[in-house]
Curated annotation (Swiss-Prot):
This is Protein translocase subunit SecA. The keyword Protein transport applies. Gene3D superfamilies: Helical scaffold and wing domains of SecA, P-loop containing nucleotide triphosphate hydrolases, SecA, preprotein cross-linking domain. Residues 882-901 have a biased composition (Basic residues). Belongs to the SecA family. Residues 828-901 are annotated as: Disordered. It is a peripheral membrane protein. HAMAP family: SecA. It comes from Cutibacterium acnes (strain DSM 16379 / KPA171202) (Propionibacterium acnes). Part of the Sec protein translocase complex. Interacts with the SecYEG preprotein conducting channel. Has a central role in coupling the hydrolysis of ATP to the transfer of proteins into and across the cell membrane, serving as an ATP-driven molecular motor driving the stepwise translocation of polypeptide chains across the membrane.
Length: 901
């Protein structure tokens, strides 16, 4: 345990004691709320809000608010919060991560702080891992909030902008991290305040916080638009790379997931393309195509990392086993996979707006999270987000038996042992959950189970539509379920079946809606739930006697958290359960860390393939390997954040300026001052040193491209005072500004100012993002010159930003004076003294703001970038920067017989 871990652990006891005191306060007043009728209980909300208006703090209200929610939940859902759930809610209110084991009721816990913070009316965001959970939780948990008078909504991926805007007005809003993040980016691309949907970032509760803030944190959210196409290179490089040999032409580091082209490979590529130097500046884009083709060949495997369905390459998320329809890898990698599989290559797109999840969630005034597995990443949560991890005790003691790992020489022997174990336990009726690491492995196990005559259900990328129902029934007698991953499934595996899920499904099939038929739904819910609980309880008791849910892990994941999430599905709420991992020396994790020593020992001892070993040393080696991968991934996420922090400072400047314009800031004063600065810079550029060295003609010509100069060049032939010249030009420019406003009219001029500012700012920002992407890709080479890449990125990125802002100012002024516009009548641009809209001339059409077909790139739970189109259906291309690279001017690099990255 390192120093940080010891410090964090030392404070846990104090926090737990404080949480226990809060539980005592809530329990001491519970009977007061039990005695209230429904109207009195619901009326507490108005009372709490009045007390907040009078200056009381949320901390003072907490015991009463939690007692109110506890009683409301009991009446509406039939669930009373346990003491440990009260503890979890208090931990969330105090901006911590509540680590609660699977089945401890995290969703119910979220009700408590959401209600308390929702009393402020500033908006609470509850972040889920998918749309399904956002919808279901907003409907079911929303029943309690609505009973107490709070407004509830959900942001779903197919919602139009106006519906989103209304949803954000609710006291509590459910949605996925991607939807919240993309709405933020879209708001900062809006051309008017009415197009913005979010109203701030007050308080967020992140469900499955480790998946969202850790697994998905390596890859930013990106909104892309069309860019120049260069699709012809992808199949060309796929052909070239198919002829290259590993370790002869290139090297692969599977742990780091990187490739390096060797000197011989460079020569082969140059000969095939008919070029002299692959690393000349004109050929720079080709390097990206080459690297992506090698990655597609060596690092991405069909039916594991992706599947090909209907002529499309669909990504498979290792952590969930789902295909993500419409999602694509960024940086040209998806096109390389399409070329490899000989399917249609989709279009390329360029970055229009981007932010990392780390920097998005760090914008919230208050942040909290829930998960069953956060302790292994505790120091990361503290360092990056300032969040503590509080392990909440289970409501009942955990009695699950976690058996030792069984390790086999070969994968075939391992699978045979799994099947034999499943057959034996299935005959007794014990429910079994088998976790696999890939779609291919789940299908292989499924085939073996079929041959063994074991009926089962499969949860993976090709069967995810019915996953909630499969999970809900996975605890029934005799159920056998194969799943690629159990993280974020959102449905509990309850021995005997999940009565709440069955009730919700039953009422939905009957056409009852918790939003539209609240009273009828509540009555039907109580009766239907009682029926399913009675049915499930009898089977629950029988399955308990069989040993509870048996979890089999078919191999270890890179992250200990994923293994713990699988194990955690068994033994919920004090139920019996058992788990065991079956491993082989051919498993991916074992293969990465060279198990040859163990293999040689097993051969020397003449151990048969079907004889496993139980070795504490091997188990320690596996855990050590997992820790290495986790540490490596943490460094990657920290590195992403360090670089994005540079962009984040620039982003806040740009987005802050945009927001001021949208909110009606005094644009005229700023633009007049900008005009003065641009004119002064133009004068000083040509009036350096002695007056006889000034180039007045060039000065007049250049400044004349910015605004119509009214000064006579000949009158300044003998001028020797640069300050006088500057003041005269400033005065002349301001007179020109006045004339321009007189020509257009005040209202039209104000609109033109706003349109020009937003249009030019957005375009320059897009170009800057492109340049920064290009800088980021090549910055690692600075290490070869003994320079810190991050320091160089900060310095050069800052210089590029300053240069972009100077260019932005000059272009804005030039547009204001030189743009030919057409005006026409528009209602509502101007109001009369009474505030009523009147008709006035406006700029028609808006300045250079074409409608773009956008795409959205976001991380999956593995942290890889994927892209979906605006309609959310058909996959599109992504922000490839080949066009920008081909235009970039860089010194040619000499070929050497060494690695090229």
């Amino acid at each position: 345990m390192n120093l940080m871990d010891r410090v964090l652990h030392a404070g846990e006891g104090k926090i737990i004691r404080r949480l226990n005191r809060i539980v005592g306060q809530v329990n001491s007043i519970e009977e007061d709320y039990v005695a209230m009728d429904d109207d009195e209980l619901a009326g507490q909300t108005a009372d709490f809000r009045q007390r907040l208006d009078n200056g009381e703090s949320l901390d003072r209200l907490l015991p009463e608010a939690f007692a109110t929610v506890r009683e409301a939940s009991k009446r509406v859902l039939g669930k009373r919060h346990f003491d440990v759930q009260i503890m979890g809610g208090a931990a969330l209110h105090q901006c911590n991560i509540a680590e609660m084991k699977t089945g401890e009721g995290k969703t119910l816990v979220g009700l408590l702080p959401a209600y308390l913070e929702g009393l402020l009316g500033e908006g609470v965001h509850i972040v889920t891992v998918n749309d399904y959970l956002a919808r279901v939780q907003s409907e079911q948990m929303g029943r309690v909030h609505r009973f107490l008078g709070l407004s509830i909504s959900a942001i779903l991926s197919d919602m139009p902008p106006m519906a989103r805007k209304e949803a954000y007005k609710a006291d509590v809003t459910y949605g996925t991290n991607n939807e919240f993040g993309f709405d933020y980016l879209r708001d900062n691309m809006a051309s008017s305040l009415s197009e913005c949907v979010q109203r701030g970032h007050h308080y967020a509760i992140v469900d499955e916080v480790d998946s969202i803030l850790v697994d998905e944190a390596r890859t930013p959210l990106i909104i892309s638009g069309p860019a120049e196409e260069n699709k012809q290179w992808y199949p060309e490089f796929a052909k070239i790379v198919s002829r290259l040999e590993r370790d002869v032409d290139y090297e692969v580091d599977e742990k780091k997931r990187t490739v390096s082209v060797l000197g011989h490979g460079i020569t082969v590529v140059e000969e095939r393309l008919g070029i002299e130097n692959l690393y000349e500046s004109a050929n720079t884009p080709l390097i990206g195509y080459l690297n992506n083709a090698i990655k597609a060949k060596e690092l991405f495997h069909r039916d594991k990392d992706y599947v090909v369905v209907g002529g499309e390459v669909l990504i498979v998320d290792e952590h969930t086993g789902r295909t993500l329809a419409g999602r694509r890898y960024n940086e040209g990698l998806h096109q390389a996979l399409e070329a490899k599989e000989h399917v249609e290559i989709k279009d390329e797109y360029q970055t229009l707006a981007t932010i990392t999840l780390q920097n998005y969630f760090r914008m919230y005034d208050k942040l909290a999270g829930m998960t069953g597995t956060a302790k292994t990443e505790e120091s990361e949560f503290q360092k990056i987000y300032g969040l503590g991890v509080i392990p909440i005790p289970t409501n009942r003691p955990m009695i699950r038996k976690d058996q030792k790992d069984l390790i086999y020489r070969t994968e075939d022997a391992k699978f045979d042992a799994i099947i034999a174990d499943v057959v034996e336990r299935h005959e007794a009726g014990q429910p079994i959950l088998i976790g696999t690491a890939s779609v291919a492995k789940s299908e292989l196990l499924s085939e073996k189970l079929k041959r063994a005559g074991v009926p089962h259900k499969v949860l993976n990328a090709k069967h995810h539509e019915s996953e909630a129902a499969i999970v809900a029934l996975a605890g029934r007698k005799g159920a056998v379920t194969v799943s690629t991953n159990m993280a974020g499934r959102g449905t509990d595996i309850i021995l005997g079946g999940n009565p709440e899920f069955l009730t919700e499904l039953d009422l939905r099939e009957k056409g009852l809606d918790p939003l539209e038929d609240q009273d009828a739904y509540q009555t039907a819910w109580n009766n239907t739930l009682a029926k399913y609980e009675e049915q499930s309880q009898a089977e629950h008791n029988e399955v308990e006697g069989l040993g509870g849910l048996y979890v089999i892990g078919s191999e270890r994941h890179e992250s200990r958290r994923i293994d713990n999430q699988l194990r955690g599905r068994s033994g919920r709420q004090g139920d019996p359960g058992e788990s065991r991992f079956y491993l082989s020396l051919q498993d991916e994790l074992m293969r990465l860390f060279k198990p040859e020593v163990i293999d040689r020992a097993m051969v020397t001892l003449k151990m048969p393939e079907d004889m496993p070993i139980e070795s504490k040393w091997v188990s320690r080696q596996i855990e050590s390997a997992q820790k290495q991968v986790e540490a490596q991934n943490f460094e990657m996420r920290k590195n992403v954040l360090k670089y994005d922090d540079v962009m984040n400072r620039q982003r806040h400047v740009i987005y802050g300026d945009r927001r001021k314009v949208l909110e009606g800031a005094d644009v005229e004063t700023e633009l007049r001052a900008t005009t003065d600065r641009v004119v002064e810079a133009g004068v000083r550029k040509y009036a350096e040193g002695y007056s006889e060295d000034w180039d007045l003609e060039a000065m007049w010509n250049e400044i004349g491209t910015v605004y119509p100069v009214g000064l006579d060049l000949d009158e300044y032939a003998d001028c020797q005072d640069v300050e006088e010249l500057i003041e005269d030009f400033k005065a002349d420019a301001q007179e020109a500004y006045d004339r321009r406003e007189s020509e257009l009219g005040e209202a039209t001029m104000r609109q033109l100012e706003r349109e020009v500012l937003l249009t030019v700012l957005d375009r320059k920002w897009r170009e800057h993002l492109y340049e920064m992407d290009y800088l980021r890709e090549g910055i690692g080479l600075r290490a070869m010159a003994q320079r810190d890449p991050l320091v160089e990125y900060q310095r050069e990125g800052g210089d590029m930003f300053n240069s972009m802002m100077d260019s932005f100012k000059e272009e804005v002024v030039g547009f204001l004076f030189n743009l030919e516009i057409e005006t026409g009548p528009q209602v509502g641009l101007v109001t009369d003294d009474g505030g009523n809209p009147v008709t006035a001339d406006s700029v028609l059409p808006k300045v250079n703001r074409p409608r773009r077909a956008l795409t959205y790139s976001a991380p999956d739970e593995q942290g890889e970038a994927e892209t979906t189109s605006e309609d959310g259906q058909k996959p599109r291309g992504e922000g490839n920067r080949a066009a920008r690279r081909s235009a970039a001017s860089k010194k040619p690099k000499n070929r050497r017989n060494k690695k090229r990255r």
